Amino acid sequence: MALSADSFISALKAQTPVLKKKNKSLIVIHFGGGYPAIDFWEDKNGAPTMGETKAAKTAADGVRINELLPKIGSQMKNAAIIRTLKSTEGDHMRGTKVMMTGLPINVLVEQPHVGSKVAWYYRENEGDLPAFISVGGGGGVGPGFLGQRYGALPISRPGSPPENATPPKEIGGATREGTDRMMRRGDLFSRLEAGFQKSTGSERDAAKSHQEVYDKALSLVVSKNKDVFALDKDVDGKPIKLMQEYAVGGDFGRGCLLARKLTEAGAACVEVNNGGWDMHANIFASLRTRLPAVDAGIGTLLKDLAERGRLQDTVVVTLSEFGRTIRVNPGGGRDHNPGLWSVMVAGGNIVGGQVYGKTSSDATSIEENPVTTGDLFATIYAALGFEKDAQIRDSLGRPSPLAGEKAKPIAQLLKTA
């Protein structure tokens, strides 16, 4: 017997309880192209390697970052800089895979995006919002062996609704009738799918995964949380207090706002993409143009999270496929450099107001505390409060720590219990 639309909706909602408040969320600021980390986070004023970049004091004693990032600087008591990151890949595609998964490339196993891993870790507490959402494009790294259930929902432009999240106008569109007809079709599809799985003995394979993805999509169609993708009001229905400050950052700033709203509404991970950082020439003119938007987006995000009491529940990290060369090339740009670069991390269990790692006087070499990609990701997972020995099984059935066998979280950056 077919379910009514109301009972089918109830069945879907029963499968997707509201996210528990104890879960922390992750916001990944993804700078596509290989961002010039030295020009963001280094402080070696006067060194020829700094070019035209000048570092300025921040709200955190002893921490200096680019003078074009004053809003981020005002929030540095809540953020930390890792200045001695060493990754392994200087090719865009390979570097993106390493830095979005936290693991070396393995030709036998397609590793999942960090957002997919976070979604998987919180799988018992899924809500009706997608657990992993990517705003403004993506880096091309998918859910890997975890499957599409843990893939990112793409949002091409902040403020736009997800594609196909409203019933087609041919069956009534965004009306009660449209929702009822959509759910009846969903009920029919589910029964056909269940029959197919039973007849082929495929309950545990791709057919079941396909059914899960379809059910998640339908749950979004009927979700009251769907309005959270709009930027005309806040999660609580009130005007957005810092809207104008975010808007200075254009689409990137609005993407940071959307990430805050989505994580507050229950998303496990939101990736905000900001591309075009492959600056082999004329880098300093480009930085003067682009850094104000970056500052508005990230600086306002950190301020907003702190003011709303959400920073302890939200980890923010800046990632890219690699950094850029310390020395400026003859064209006035910087080339690919995975060997020494920096990231910012804030929120969750992170102790802000500090720099980890020491570079030489001209920033060309590491003097203290090198950090591997695995160490960085182990620190991210620890900042989220993941169990220290949390493991995941790959497509070959092999268990391994989320950040790899040799990875160790950076104790200095983490709050003690």
Where are these regions (language model features)?
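Ligand-binding pockets and gating/stacking loops
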Residues: 1-417
